Amino acid sequence: MNRRLAIKQIMIFGGGLALLPSGLRAAGKASVWLNHVRMDAAEEKLLGEIAEIIIPKTTTPGAKDLGLHLFVMKMVDDCYKPQDQKRFMSGLAAFKGLDPTALKEMVVQVNAGKAESDDIKAFFRIMKQQTINGYLNSKYVMTNLVKWELVPARYNGYFPVKS
């Protein structure tokens, strides 16, 4: 057998194996791999809409453009206790089925402290906190909006000292 042909076939087979997990994922699943929380594509889209209400697109990219809803999903899955994850999911359920104007109204009311239940308050607290955290630590903000110094608080030997 020709060595080039064998190497070519092995590379094609390896590429197919690398793509296999994405093809086996069921339709309607979340686009981020989650271990502890179960979300579907509709809930992921809803999180994206809520994040976009929290940080809308202006002259800078909004939350959806930066993928902050994916960050929130991963943070809730990895960093929160199971009871907080359950409260997050039950709070998210209250936002399902709302049209965009009703969704915005509900987010404004919950942000003003007029939530119907503690689960909704817990959901919105986590959602807002992690959305802002993700925005401030996003690549766009850290490279375009924050002045970066290689060595922060450098030594200034000529600083005037009053005696």
What are these language model-derived features?
Residues 1-5, 20-54:
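C-terminal segment of N-terminal export signals and the immediately downstream linker at the start
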Residues 63:
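A glycine-rich, hydrophobic loop/mini-helix early in the fold
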Residues 10-15:
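Sec-dependent signal peptide hydrophobic core
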